[in-house]
Amino acid sequence: RYGWHDSPFGDCLMVATDRGMCGLGFVLPEGREATAADLLARWDQARLVDDSSATAPYARRAFGDEGGPLNLVLRGTPFQLKVWEALMRIPAGSVVSYEKLAQHIGKPTAARAVAGAVALNPVSWVVPCHRVIRGTGISTGYRWGPARKRVLLALEAAQWEREGAAD
């Protein structure tokens, strides 16, 4: 099942199975059709049903409007899964380089392969690929657009500052 939803970062496409959310993407510059074709192509054997009522709970949980667990169903190579799991351990408000992420997963010479796995992350925002930058500190190569990446990082930094100030 899939459905379009509003998010703090613009329209997003959510994809879910009976076991959990397996895709989240933001509208590409080419529009909704291109976004849907790009994201839904990952499940070429699946019978896809447009059902935004079924994906709405995932959207609410992903963007903090509703509490509760957010079950993820990730499909990838063992290496990709390892990278995506490492992404979920990067604290909100923080960024790491591809090189540091490669070191973190025990593959210090695999920064390019890590970058490739980050780029194929099917669940944007929830698996926070936006928290990875070049070793030079430059924020580049975000599938959903560099402006959106800057907004995601700025929002997280602001939330982190607010929460830190409250302590």
Predicted regions, residues:
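Basic nucleic-acid-binding alpha-helical/helix-turn surface characteristic of O6-alkylguanine DNA
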Residues: 1-109, 155-167
